[in-house]
Amino acid sequence: MTQKHGKNYVAAVAKVEAEKAYALNDAVSLVKEIDFAKFDASVEVVFKLNVDTRQADQQLRGAVVLPNGTGKDKTVVVFAQGDKAKEAEAAGADVVGAADLVQRIQGGWLDFDVAVATPDMMAQVGRVGRALGPKGLMPNPKTGTVTMDVTKAVSDAKGGQVTYRTDRDGNVAVPVGRVSFEEGKLAENIKSIAETVLKARPAAVKGTYVQHVSISSTFGPAVTLDINTL
């Protein structure tokens, strides 16, 4: 069944040249222009990569702190004990705990955006892996959320860090801010994640690595980016 789009979406699509790859600054300007949401919509960049995600060494996963943040205040929880718990509290973590935090999550509480854990807590955190995993909340060394440096982890999470990973089709989708952001700040954020994705190119990849890049707002149509302008 063909999905029907509303008149606002159709009008937005009409302003996008389907076969054109826009320079970064032009693409950002257009995405802001054609957004029709009645709220401050998120802006997302999507990279289509030439990777075989069936191979473990071609699965990308990591984190990057965007220079201008994401426009979202994140709630951060930290699994830690003793001095590391005090350190996390001092760093500004919203909730810090150990077995008590595990029990709270077992009870159904998942009202947070980022979970950080010290390595010694991972055995306990594993007890709630089935709750955290599907939500993308499971602490992981690759994203800097399993660490003894809880101060940095909390600071990064609060300061605009985003995580990225390839889906099964080789796509990497990352939020880079909001429509209300100045064009230059959105462009800087997009360049930052682009540099990170390019540096993460798996050694086994042959030929063209980045096949396509686009940006869009929450409900708006995608605008294709000229990769050479990133």
From Swiss-Prot:
Taxonomic superkingdom: Bacteria
InterPro entries noted in UniProt: Ribosom_uL1_bac-type (IPR005878), Ribosomal_uL1 (IPR002143), Ribosomal_uL1-like (IPR023674), Ribosomal_uL1/biogenesis (IPR028364), Ribosomal_uL1_3-a/b-sand (IPR016095), Ribosomal_uL1_CS (IPR023673)
GO terms for cellular component: large ribosomal subunit
Keyword NAD on entry: no
Gene Ontology terms describing biological process: regulation of translation; translation
Gene3D superfamilies named in the record: 3.30.190.20, 3.40.50.790
GO molecular function: rRNA binding; structural constituent of ribosome; tRNA binding
Keyword Cell wall biogenesis/degradation in record: no
Keywords assigned by UniProt, alphabetized: Repressor, Ribonucleoprotein, Ribosomal protein, RNA-binding, rRNA-binding, Translation regulation, tRNA-binding
Function description: Binds directly to 23S rRNA. The L1 stalk is quite mobile in the ribosome, and is involved in E site tRNA release.
Subunit composition and interactions: Part of the 50S ribosomal subunit.
NCBIfam families in UniProt: rplA_bact (TIGR01169)
Record-linked PANTHER family: 54S RIBOSOMAL PROTEIN L1, MITOCHONDRIAL, LARGE RIBOSOMAL SUBUNIT PROTEIN UL1M
Similarity remark: Belongs to the universal ribosomal protein uL1 family.
Protein name as it appears in the record: Large ribosomal subunit protein uL1
Organism expressing this protein natively: Leuconostoc mesenteroides subsp. mesenteroides (strain ATCC 8293 / DSM 20343 / BCRC 11652 / CCM 1803 / JCM 6124 / NCDO 523 / NBRC 100496 / NCIMB 8023 / NCTC 12954 / NRRL B-1118 / 37Y)
Gene from which the chain derives: rplA
